C-alpha cells in the first residue's frame, strides 16, 4: 500500500516511517523537505495514496491539520481508503488547563471535533482512526517530569490500526497513555 504521512522527520512521524517503510511505499511530507501543512497544495501528494497519516502540527497555522483532514476527507469520503489523524489526549483537557500549549490543545480539540462529525456520516466508506497519545517522548515535552510514551509505541498503535482496517475493522478512536505508578 501507498502511505502518505506528514511530519515524518522526527518524533512520532519518524517512528511511523521507520516502522512502515519496509512493508509500504511511503510518501513523506515534511517541512525539512519543503512540505508544510500550512500550504494545502501538498494535497496532490496525498490523494494518490491509500492511507493518509495526518501527523504534523503547525505552530504558525494551528488549524492546518484540521483543514488538511477536511480536504482529504472530502475527496476520500466514498472510497475504501484510510485516514489516521494523530490527535492528542489534550482533547479531554479543560480549557482552563490549556495554559502551556493553548494553540496546540485547541487545534487538537478542533481536529477531534472534525473527526467525530465525519464519523457519524452514514454514507461514508473511508476508514478513519484518531490516535490520541498522552505525553510522548518528543521535543515538545523534553525535560518534563511526566510519564512519557516512547514514539515507537505510538507507531505500533498506528500500524495495528492499519492492519485492522485492512481486515475490515475500523478503530475510530485509540487513546493511549503511559500507566502511572
Which residues does each predicted region cover?
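Adenosine-cofactor binding site in Rossmann-like domains, unifying the SAM/SAH pocket
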Residues: 25-44, 58-67
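C-terminal helical subdomain
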Residues: 130-131, 143-181
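Rossmann-fold scaffold of SDR-type NAD(P)-dependent oxidoreductases
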Residues: 6-7, 49-58, 65, 82-87, ...
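Catalytic loop of short-chain dehydrogenase/reductase
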Residues: 58-61, 73-123, 132-135
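A short, aliphatic-rich alpha-helical micro-motif
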Residues: 46-47, 104
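N-terminal Rossmann NAD(P)H-binding glycine-rich loop of SDR-like oxidoreductase domains
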Residues: 4-22
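Short-chain dehydrogenase/reductase
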Residues: 6, 66, 100-113, 147-152
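A generic structural motif
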Residues: 22-27, 125-126
